[in-house]
Amino acid sequence: MHTKIHLPPCILLLLLFSLPSFNVVVGGDGESGNPFTPKGYLIRYWKKQISNDLPKPWFLLNKASPLNAAQYATYTKLVADQNALTTQLHTFCSSANLMCAPDLSPSLEKHSGDIHFATYSDKNFTNYGTNEPGIGVNTFKNYSEGENIPVNSFRRYGRGSPRDNKFDNYASDGNVIDQSFNSYSTSTAGGSGKFTNYAANANDPNLHFTSYSDQGTGGVQKFTIYSQEANAGDQYFKSYGKNGNGANGEFVSYGNDTNVIGSTFTNYGQTANGGDQKFTSYGFNGNVPENHFTNYGAGGNGPSETFNSYRDQSNVGDDTFTTYVKDANGGEANFTNYGQSFNEGTDVFTTYGKGGNDPHINFKTYGVNNTFKDYVKDTATFSNYHNKTSQVLASLMEVNGGKKVNNRWVEPGKFFREKMLKSGTIMPMPDIKDKMPKRSFLPRVIASKLPFSTSKIAELKKIFHAGDESQVEKMIGDALSECERAPSAGETKRCVNSAEDMIDFATSVLGRNVVVRTTEDTKGSNGNIMIGSVKGINGGKVTKSVSCHQTLYPYLLYYCHSVPKVRVYEADILDPNSKVKINHGVAICHVDTSSWGPSHGAFVALGSGPGKIEVCHWIFENDMTWAIAD
């Protein structure tokens, strides 16, 4: 026999508020949770603002802040005092699922070269193998490999030591990395140095390398790979082989095969005495690179300088080379290939061999659309200068019916024509996986109290512990600048830093009877797929939609914009061999491309030009598109 206990309503309410983790069903599958959490509030807000009863978009609602009710109340109060919030930043970031870089304090550790490190990460490394005497090898194998949001500083490696120095891998395969390397093999006498791999395959890197093999005597130094196949971000290399005496240096590859990288190399082999210097490849095969090389071999005495390739086969972008072997005394300088672009960019070469004392200078190939401001006319020899479209350029472009079909800078399947969206079509699918760090929205009440303007970057740096020239500072500045950019012709845009703001923007453009869609998952990425059944949204008619794309920021931030004259489709994605459904994709086709730039990746991949063709693309993981409900 069970005894029924009757409690007054006020006692029940008291119990509810005293148990923040108490589960209360607020209706429907997947809606179980505390209604006083940010997610509970978002679910209620969706019901209030959206006028239809279609299934809820859990891929959006699950991006709500994971704060529980007690944490929500605490941080809502704390954010009113930003000084108090910044003292508890890392607890806040952990609880709210934000992206915050670690605070690294300077390390006073010193390690001799007899210690051979295999792996090392997430610390400032002050001193390795400095002033080590005698013969031997300093070996450092892996530093900060494959990390997510790593912040590392390596201050000094092998300074003043005659030993051979080897550094295998530094910050490769990292995501949103902030790395600085201060000094490598400086002031050494004899010995050889080899740095194999620095920040290869990094996504959105912020790289600073201050000094490599400066003031060395004799010896051979080799830097093999610097930031190869990196995506977005910026990199800076300040000095290589400066003030060397009879030292030989070789830099094999810098910033090759990159996508939208900003690259600055300040000084290579300045005021070196004798020795052979060789730079094999800089910025080869880049997509929209911004390359700046300030000074190569200036003030050298009897140097032998060779620069093999600069910006060869790159796609648009801008490049500057300021000085090459300026004020050199005798010696020989050879520059083999500059600016042989696939698609023309802007190339400026300021001075070559100026002020030199009887240098022997050869310049082999200089590309199209370049500006050469000053060179030594008496001693410089130009083998080949292209002032029109070059044969090399033409050989890289296959033209078929006026269409460029060489699309090696654009991933296969990233852009396609509308006619491809038919059942039975086999086509490549790009990598639609989300590469950004996982984050959640902030609750609207908290996000609204944080600064959100380029004029408030100093305050944001303080809140998020962002140092000067750090990745976090750059990330915040880039995001806010894009948010404040004037809209393109016909575009309505807004950056939304809460799910509620996204709902408000979408409904302000499309009305309250809306549906938000995304591609179901990432299956089929990087391979061939077969198109199954296809459904045109709004009857397949030209309509308008709101698309929202992630932006890199400490908390989840979306750039949402309404683009007129589009058609939106849903399509089953099949395995091309088994014909089994593996995914359900959402694609958007832009009918009017007249305002797009002629160098847009879609035209590189598909041919034609602005306003001449429609262009379609898939909605990538964690991006989404809104449309009026059918």
Swiss-Prot record:
Intracellular or extracellular location(s): Secreted, Extracellular space, Apoplast; Secreted, Cell wall
Signal peptide: 1-27
Induction profile: Transiently repressed by ethylene.
Annotated GO biological process: cell wall organization; fruit ripening
GO cellular component: apoplast
Keyword field: Apoplast, Cell wall, Cell wall biogenesis/degradation, Fruit ripening, Glycoprotein, Secreted, Signal
Role according to the record: Non-catalytic subunit of the polygalacturonase isozyme 1 (PG1). Necessary and sufficient to convert the polygalacturonase from its monomeric form PG2 to its heterodimeric form PG1. Seems to limit the depolymerization and solubilization of cell wall polyuronides mediated by PG2 during ripening, probably by recruiting PG2 to form PG1.
PANTHER family: POLYGALACTURONASE 1 BETA-LIKE PROTEIN 2 (PTHR31458:SF2)
Name of the protein in question: Polygalacturonase-1 non-catalytic subunit beta
Biological source species: Solanum lycopersicum (Tomato)
